[in-house]
Each structure stands twice: as structure tokens, then as C-alpha cells.
Amino acid sequence: PRGGVCSIGGVLIFGELDEERAAAVEARLRSIAEAAAERGRDSFGVVVLSRSGLYRWYKDRRPAPEALRDMPRLIDEGSAAAIFNNRAEPTTEHVSEKTPDDIQPMLGERIAVTHNGTIANDLELERRYGLRRRSRIDTAVLPPLLEKIWDGSLEGLRRILRDEVVGSFALAVLDSARPGRLWLAANFRPLYYMWDRQLNALFFASSDAYLQGDVAPWDGNYVGRLEPYTVVEIGVDRTWRSASLWRADSEPGRRRRALVVASGGLDSTTAAAALLRQGYEVALLHFNYRHVAEDPERRAVREISKALGIPLIEVDMDFFKLAGRSPLLGEGEINRVDMGREGAEFAHEWVPARNFVFIALAVALAEAWGYDYVALGVNMEEAGAYPDNEMELVRLLNRALPYATGPQRRVQLLMPVGHLVKHEIVRLGLEAGAPLHLTWSCYDKGPKHCGRCGPCYMRRLAFKINGVRDPVEYDLPPEAEEEFWRGTRPYVWRPPRPEPKGSA
């Protein structure tokens, strides 16, 4: 049987305990365990480790709120740590007659483990290392495995969890030989921790909501997330050491393959050229989503691909026909008030969740085809009007992506121009050798840039601020164009070259 979906939690207690603090720690631990029953109601167990290295355990087939009512005192003045587990037993793995050994946390001779997830290769580990476990539940293989091959170090635990164990996990480990230590680890299962200043104790659980509700900052405690694919060692001497569980080929910076979501415009083209200059292997990903400017954008991105000598992947999609309701999709008029100024300052041409949809599809392709990064042309200028250009969206999505891709399939989002406004993007594009003369920015279908929509307005000003005449043509009176560009120098394209190694 598999471990299934559970909630785990516990506490590591710092300093000497008196009766009052022990009671308060227990009250907090019980409230966390009861809240965590949301993620598991088929059994409940708790293991308490004393400062002298002795275990006490209490296990019950009932859910935590019922089981805890009948359990004796858990935390006393000699307690060092405790771990618990609320198990949600999958329908296909129902065990009608559970023994205490079938209820987590799992105990060995020295090691106690509470685990949320599935160990897919438990039988293989059992055979390979000649292990004897006390239950057929997959998690039961972990205590004997650690007792047999773990040297007790953080690095040793990292190696076992990264290279030996196959499956999903958020787990906590106690060792009776070292009662002042706690190890927490997670790949793509959630795990949060909270430092309780008043109680001088570190609590942890499968959700931040179980640790602390909504409180004013001055009334609350620090709550953090254990980052996916991380293992930490925590000591009552205030040791906090962490190590990555990403395999070597998934470590950041080891491989540099980037898939750039490319519209054919200034921002994504500059992003691609900047990455090329930094030594990335780059490919362009373009979506033909039945928008008004589809034809000129498609022509532009194809020419950009040729000019930069990089692959282009095109995806044809009809999805946004269902969403509709945007001038970019042919419904309504493109805003050209005040030569595009108004369109540059407000999202009149918003396409529902467009960037979010593109990001999801790009991440799927990146995972499938071995790209480490998806790069976007989001930028600070357009974030003022379009929420999906905000850097915070990318930052938050990066935190969520380990839960969206397969095990050890790391894909991260990059925003090479995310911190720049439009004239800074043009300057970077000129420096990085982006073929800006091939780009298409206009919301309309041409054949020339209209010169009166929001993107045209920003583009023209951005080039002028840099003292360079925009190389694309605008559908504006020639005399007005000559007057606007007077005093600027001609645009010159210099293809990108990789930066020398060691340069900033």
C-alpha cells in the first residue's frame, strides 16, 4: 500500500521547558494537528522524542480531533520534539484492519519519520538493501533505510532523497541519538514552518493556514515555506543548514536553454538578443491566436528568427475565439486617442489572461523538449497598464512552477527586460544587437505601423529618447515624420555576439 495524501506536522523545542511553556507548546501542537485533519481523516499518530533520546508514541484509527481527546499529555518538561501525521487513505488502498505499525509516523530503532506522499520504489529499496520494515505501507521503508545507509549528515540525507528515493514527499525525520535535531525535506509536496517567538519553538505543517491565521504583523510569528526540492537540518543550537534536492542536471545555471515567448515586437526580440549575448541557447515560441495583427507579427517573428539564426516554433490556436471581447481579437475599436497616449496608459485592448495562457503552454513545451527557462518580454512600462506584465506575477509563478511540472523537471521563468521601461528596452536592444528593424509593435495589421495606437506611441518615443530614428515605417504624414525625427541618427543593426566569459 502507498502512503497516500497526508498532512504532517510537529515541533522542535528550544531551551529548557517549564510546566507552563510545555503546556502552551502542547496546546499549539494540538491545534495545528486538528486543523491539519483537513488533509487526512483516516488515522492519526504522534511521536514525541525526549531530551534523553526516548520515544513515546500514540496512534489511533480515528481522525485527529477525536483521537486527541483521548490521548494523554504529549509534551512535558523533558520533551525535545514531536512529529504527527494525519493520513488520507486512498480508496484503492483501504486497509480495514490497521495495526499501530500501519499508522504514521513510522518508527525504526532510532529513526522516526512522518511523510506526506508516495515512495514508488519501496520494494526495490527493500530488496537492494535487505531492509526489514514493520508495515507494508510504503513509508515504512524509510526508517530502516535511513538507519542502514544514512551517515547522519545533511549531505548524506540529500543524496538518499535525491538519488535513492523515487516518488513524492514532504517529510520530517527525528533521530533518537540526536534529540536536538530535526530534518525537514520536500520535493513537490508542501511544507511550511513557523518560528513562535513566545514559545521558543519551531512548528511545521503541510499548510501555512494550519500554523497561523490572519493576524496583525505585530501579533503574529514568522511563517516560511520550505522551498520545493530542499532539505534542511535544524538544531536547538540555532543551526539552520539547507541543501538542494534538484539533481545536477537541474541545478540553476548548469544548462542554459531558453524558450522565448516571442510576439515579434520590441520587448521579446530584445529579450532574445540579450539572452543570446549572455550565452544562452535560444529558441523562439510564437502564438498565432487569430488576433488582428497576426499576419505582420508572424512575418516579423520569422524574419527575426532568421536574422538571429535561432529556431522558431509556431503554435496556431483558436482558444481566444471563445474568450473574445477584445479589440485585439477584432471586437471593438483600437484606442487611438491622443496619438496613442491613452492606449499606452490603460489596458483598453486587454485579452483575457493571454500571457497566463501563453506561459502555461510555454512551460509545458519547455518541460517536454528539455528547455530550462521560459523567457518573457514582460516589462515595467506595460505593467502600469497590463497586470500580466507585472514582475510580481512572474516571481509568484516561479514559486509555483515546481508543483506544475514533473518530478525533477525544473522550468523557470525569466524576464530579461522585466525591470526596464520602453526607452531602456530600446537602448538594450541596440546594445545587444536585437534586429529591431524587423519587429512589429502595432496593434493593427498594417502594412505600416499606424503610429496612433498605444504600442506605436511608446515605440516612437522610446526611439526618440535614445536619439535614434525608428527603422520601421509609420502611416503618418511624411512632413510630420521628418519633424518628429529631426536631430536623431540613423538606426544601424549590429548582430549580437556572446559576451566574453567573466564579463558582467
How should each PLM-predicted stretch be described?
Residues P1-G253:
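Conserved short alpha-helical segments that host acidic/polar catalytic motifs at enzyme active sites
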Residues S7-I8, S43, F356, A360, ...:
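Local cysteine-cluster metal-coordination motifs and their immediate loop/turn environment
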Residues L12, G377, R459:
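Conserved residues at the C-terminal ends of beta-strands
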Residues R30, A140-P143, A205, R302, ...:
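Predominant activation on well-ordered alpha-helical scaffold segments within soluble catalytic domains
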Residues R254-A432:
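ATP-dependent adenylation/nucleotidyltransferase module used to activate substrates
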Residues V417-Y443, E481-E482, G487-T488:
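Short, charged low-complexity linear segments at domain edges
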Residues K448, G454-L476, E481:
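Iron-sulfur (Fe-S) cluster-binding segments and ferredoxin-like electron-carrier domains
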Residues L476-A504:
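Long, charge-rich boundary regions
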